[in-house]
């Protein structure tokens, strides 16, 4: 193993730079040349790569986003597109590739393995929705960003006796909504995984909150539920309580990564390099029971992940 490539793919997440840095510096430690592949699989398609050194990744640990940039590459999903990518990887002499991203990126990693390129994947996504891993890089920073935003919205909601709906990311998974909702003392948390009734699960808690003398109501809604603007209008019409909706959007993806994200990303990045050195391939580096370990990509993608029942059951106890 003399030369490897590293790419970030899909949505960006805080901590990706810490992972890239760990890959590059661990590679340098073992005498391996590391090529940074720009814009994810697009960089493989266009042969957009450059050598990275221990010095070139200095001052990146604290930066949000990804210094390699990222993109979604539909062409790589076609056999013809993949052949172009494989030819470029061969031309660069890559002995292995490390992919940082979500489940779609992992499927691309499996294709690379089939083509004869030893590939290791690691989870970098704010959604925390990788089935085989207890944690994904970027999640903690995202939660802190949401918490800070909701705390500020609460300040102005209290001043105006308002109900505030806040939409957070999570198209298919409600981890951000659930944990941020608990951390922010939300009266209502709506996630895609749980059935809900507008009258029982939204209107009733808002009215009960007002009856108890509270000066605000906070409703956290996962992106997969959506419709917060219309929901706000209906709440105001039916309760008479002034209601406003906020979509936090891409602010959740940015910002300097937290300590947790920097440390876990560094651990995972180093582990990726070491697995390649051990001759392993087609693996996902994951967090399981607070330990960094690995699992076969196909096996990992086939697993199911559910919201922690302990947290789901905690919500009604905290909203009395």
Q: Positions of the model-derived regions?
A:
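N-terminal phosphate-binding or glycine-rich loops at protein starts, especially the Walker A/P-loop
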Residues: 1-45
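Short, ordered loop/turn segments at secondary-structure junctions
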Residues: 9-12, 37-42, 72-73, 102-104, ...
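Short Gly/Thr/Asp-enriched flexible loops that form oxyanion-binding sites at enzyme active sites
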Residues: 18-23, 104-117, 177
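Flexible, glycine/charged-enriched surface loops at secondary-structure junctions
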Residues: 32-38, 156-163, 215-219, 242-248, ...
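Glycine-rich oxoanion-binding loops at beta->alpha junctions
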Residues: 44-97, 104-105, 137-144, 148, ...
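Accessory alpha-helical/coil subdomains and C-terminal extensions
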Residues: 99-101, 111, 139-242
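Short, acidic/small-residue loops that bind anionic groups at enzyme active sites
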Residues: 113-138, 145, 190-194, 247
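C-terminal non-catalytic interaction/assembly regions of soluble proteins
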Residues: 227-230, 235-320
């Amino acid at each position: 193993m003399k030369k490897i490539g590293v790419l970030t793919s899909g949505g960006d997440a805080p901590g990706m730079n810490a992972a890239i840095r760990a890959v590059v510096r661990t590679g340098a430690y073992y005498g391996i040349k590391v090529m940074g592949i720009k814009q994810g699989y697009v960089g493989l398609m266009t042969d957009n790569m450059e050598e990275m050194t221990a010095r070139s990744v200095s001052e990146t640990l604290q930066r949000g986003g990804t210094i390699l940039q990222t993109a979604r590459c539909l062409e790589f999903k076609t056999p013809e597109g993949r052949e172009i990518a494989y030819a470029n990887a061969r031309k660069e002499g890559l002995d292995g590739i490390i992919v940082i991203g979500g489940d779609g990126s992992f499927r691309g990693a499996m294709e690379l393995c089939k083509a004869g390129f030893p590939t290791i994947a690691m989870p970098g996504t704010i959604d925390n929705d990788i089935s085989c891993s207890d944690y994904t890089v970027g999640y903690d920073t995202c939660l802190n960003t949401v918490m800070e935003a909701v705390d500020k919205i609460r300040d102005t909601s209290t001043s105006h006796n308002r109900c505030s709906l806040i939409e957070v990311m999570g198209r298919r998974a409600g981890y951000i909504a659930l944990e941020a909702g608990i951390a922010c003392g939300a009266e209502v948390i709506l996630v895609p995984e749980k059935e809900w009734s507008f009258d029982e699960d939204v209107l009733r808690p808002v009215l009960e909150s007002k009856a108890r003398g509270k000066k605000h109501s906070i409703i956290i809604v996962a992106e997969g539920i959506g419709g917060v603007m219309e929901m706000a209008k209906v709440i105001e019409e039916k309760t008479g309580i002034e209601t406003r909706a906020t979509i936090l959007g891409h602010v959740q993806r940015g910002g300097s990564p937290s300590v947790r994200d920097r440390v876990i990303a560094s651990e995972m990045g180093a582990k990726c390099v070491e697995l390649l050195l051990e001759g392993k391939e087609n693996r996902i580096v994951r967090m399981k029971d607070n330990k960094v370990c690995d699992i076969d990509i196909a096996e990992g993608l086939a697993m199911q992940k559910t919201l922690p029942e302990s947290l789901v059951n905690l919500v009604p106890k905290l909203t009395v």
